[in-house]
Amino acid sequence: MFDILMYLFENYVHSEVELLVDEDELTQELTRAGFHQSAIIKALSWLEHLASLQESDQPYLCNHDQHSFRIYTQAEMEKLDVECRGFLLFLEQIKVLNVELREMVIDRVMELDEPALILEDLKWVILMVLFNVPGNESAYEQMEDLIFEQPDGRLHS
Protein backbone atom coordinates (compact mmCIF):
# COMPACT_ATOMS: atom_id res chain seq x y z
CA MET A 1 0.00 0.00 0.00
CA PHE A 2 2.82 2.44 0.83
CA ASP A 3 4.26 1.88 -2.66
CA ILE A 4 0.96 3.02 -4.16
CA LEU A 5 0.87 6.13 -2.00
CA MET A 6 4.42 6.96 -3.07
CA TYR A 7 3.53 6.33 -6.72
CA LEU A 8 0.53 8.66 -6.52
CA PHE A 9 2.44 11.34 -4.68
CA GLU A 10 5.43 11.28 -7.02
CA ASN A 11 3.48 10.95 -10.27
CA TYR A 12 0.56 13.24 -9.59
CA VAL A 13 0.94 15.47 -6.58
CA HIS A 14 4.64 16.16 -6.46
CA SER A 15 4.98 16.49 -10.23
CA GLU A 16 1.98 18.88 -10.22
CA VAL A 17 0.13 16.75 -12.78
CA GLU A 18 -3.62 16.96 -12.33
CA LEU A 19 -4.80 14.04 -10.21
CA LEU A 20 -7.55 11.99 -11.79
CA VAL A 21 -10.74 12.68 -9.88
CA ASP A 22 -12.57 9.56 -11.04
CA GLU A 23 -11.70 6.74 -8.65
CA ASP A 24 -12.35 4.10 -11.34
CA GLU A 25 -9.91 5.75 -13.75
CA LEU A 26 -7.34 6.07 -10.99
CA THR A 27 -7.81 2.40 -10.06
CA GLN A 28 -7.33 1.38 -13.70
CA GLU A 29 -4.18 3.51 -13.94
CA LEU A 30 -2.77 1.90 -10.80
CA THR A 31 -3.66 -1.57 -12.07
CA ARG A 32 -1.85 -0.84 -15.34
CA ALA A 33 1.13 0.30 -13.26
CA GLY A 34 1.21 -3.20 -11.73
CA PHE A 35 -0.44 -2.72 -8.35
CA HIS A 36 -2.86 -5.28 -6.88
CA GLN A 37 -6.53 -4.41 -6.52
CA SER A 38 -6.65 -4.98 -2.74
CA ALA A 39 -3.65 -2.70 -2.16
CA ILE A 40 -5.17 -0.04 -4.42
CA ILE A 41 -8.41 -0.07 -2.42
CA LYS A 42 -6.47 0.26 0.86
CA ALA A 43 -4.36 3.13 -0.48
CA LEU A 44 -7.37 5.06 -1.78
CA SER A 45 -9.14 4.52 1.54
CA TRP A 46 -6.01 5.80 3.33
CA LEU A 47 -6.10 8.98 1.22
CA GLU A 48 -9.84 9.46 1.79
CA HIS A 49 -9.32 9.14 5.54
CA LEU A 50 -6.49 11.68 5.37
CA ALA A 51 -8.82 14.15 3.67
CA SER A 52 -11.56 13.47 6.23
CA LEU A 53 -9.21 14.21 9.16
CA GLN A 54 -9.25 17.88 8.17
CA GLU A 55 -12.96 18.07 8.96
CA SER A 56 -12.80 15.72 11.91
CA ASP A 57 -14.05 16.53 15.35
CA GLN A 58 -11.81 13.86 16.86
CA PRO A 59 -10.92 14.98 20.38
CA TYR A 60 -7.23 14.32 19.82
CA LEU A 61 -7.26 16.84 17.00
CA CYS A 62 -9.12 19.54 18.91
CA ASN A 63 -8.27 19.45 22.61
CA HIS A 64 -4.63 19.80 23.47
CA ASP A 65 -2.22 21.67 25.63
CA GLN A 66 0.72 23.18 23.76
CA HIS A 67 2.98 22.28 26.69
CA SER A 68 1.94 18.63 26.86
CA PHE A 69 4.30 15.78 26.06
CA ARG A 70 3.24 12.97 23.72
CA ILE A 71 3.24 9.48 25.25
CA TYR A 72 3.23 6.81 22.55
CA THR A 73 1.25 3.59 22.84
CA GLN A 74 3.00 0.25 22.54
CA ALA A 75 1.63 -0.22 19.01
CA GLU A 76 2.85 3.24 18.01
CA MET A 77 6.31 2.52 19.43
CA GLU A 78 6.47 -0.71 17.44
CA LYS A 79 5.59 1.11 14.23
CA LEU A 80 7.68 4.24 14.94
CA ASP A 81 11.14 3.54 16.32
CA VAL A 82 13.10 5.95 18.52
CA GLU A 83 14.59 7.69 15.49
CA CYS A 84 11.14 8.31 13.98
CA ARG A 85 9.66 9.53 17.26
CA GLY A 86 12.65 11.81 17.77
CA PHE A 87 12.18 13.21 14.28
CA LEU A 88 8.53 14.01 15.01
CA LEU A 89 9.60 15.84 18.17
CA PHE A 90 12.27 17.72 16.21
CA LEU A 91 9.67 18.82 13.64
CA GLU A 92 7.45 20.13 16.43
CA GLN A 93 10.34 22.03 17.96
CA ILE A 94 11.18 23.75 14.66
CA LYS A 95 7.46 24.44 14.05
CA VAL A 96 7.08 22.28 10.94
CA LEU A 97 4.43 20.27 12.81
CA ASN A 98 1.98 21.40 15.43
CA VAL A 99 0.11 19.06 17.78
CA GLU A 100 -2.78 18.52 15.36
CA LEU A 101 -0.53 17.78 12.39
CA ARG A 102 1.61 15.42 14.48
CA GLU A 103 -1.51 13.49 15.48
CA MET A 104 -2.66 13.37 11.85
CA VAL A 105 0.75 11.96 10.88
CA ILE A 106 0.59 9.33 13.64
CA ASP A 107 -2.98 8.45 12.64
CA ARG A 108 -1.92 7.93 9.02
CA VAL A 109 1.20 5.97 10.00
CA MET A 110 -0.84 3.61 12.16
CA GLU A 111 -3.19 2.87 9.28
CA LEU A 112 -0.37 1.79 6.97
CA ASP A 113 -0.05 -1.96 6.60
CA GLU A 114 3.71 -1.81 7.23
CA PRO A 115 4.83 -3.45 10.50
CA ALA A 116 7.35 -0.65 11.12
CA LEU A 117 8.37 2.51 9.31
CA ILE A 118 11.86 3.68 8.60
CA LEU A 119 12.63 7.38 8.90
CA GLU A 120 12.64 7.96 5.13
CA ASP A 121 9.11 6.53 4.83
CA LEU A 122 7.91 8.62 7.77
CA LYS A 123 9.22 11.74 6.05
CA TRP A 124 7.06 10.97 3.01
CA VAL A 125 3.97 10.42 5.17
CA ILE A 126 4.61 13.78 6.83
CA LEU A 127 4.96 15.42 3.42
CA MET A 128 1.65 13.88 2.28
CA VAL A 129 -0.13 15.13 5.39
CA LEU A 130 1.31 18.64 5.04
CA PHE A 131 0.35 18.75 1.37
CA ASN A 132 -3.24 17.78 2.15
CA VAL A 133 -3.85 20.29 4.93
CA PRO A 134 -4.39 23.84 3.64
CA GLY A 135 -2.36 26.64 5.19
CA ASN A 136 0.82 24.63 5.70
CA GLU A 137 2.70 25.66 2.57
CA SER A 138 5.72 26.94 4.51
CA ALA A 139 5.91 23.77 6.61
CA TYR A 140 5.56 21.70 3.42
CA GLU A 141 8.49 23.55 1.84
CA GLN A 142 10.61 23.06 4.97
CA MET A 143 9.78 19.36 4.98
CA GLU A 144 10.58 19.08 1.29
CA ASP A 145 13.98 20.63 1.99
CA LEU A 146 14.58 18.10 4.77
CA ILE A 147 13.74 15.23 2.42
CA PHE A 148 15.72 16.36 -0.59
CA GLU A 149 18.74 18.00 1.04
CA GLN A 150 21.92 16.10 0.35
CA PRO A 151 24.52 16.17 3.11
CA ASP A 152 27.88 17.21 1.71
CA GLY A 153 29.85 15.04 4.12
CA ARG A 154 31.45 17.95 5.98
CA LEU A 155 31.02 18.15 9.72
CA HIS A 156 32.01 21.82 9.96
CA SER A 157 31.56 24.70 7.57
Curated annotation (Swiss-Prot):
Q: List the disulfide bonds.
A: none
| Pfam families per the UniProt record, alphabetical | DUF494
Q: Which family does it belong to?
A: Belongs to the Smg family.
NCBIfam families named among the record's database cross-references: PRK03430.1
Q: What is this protein called?
A: Protein Smg homolog
- Biological classification of the source: Bacteria, Pseudomonadati, Pseudomonadota, Gammaproteobacteria, Alteromonadales
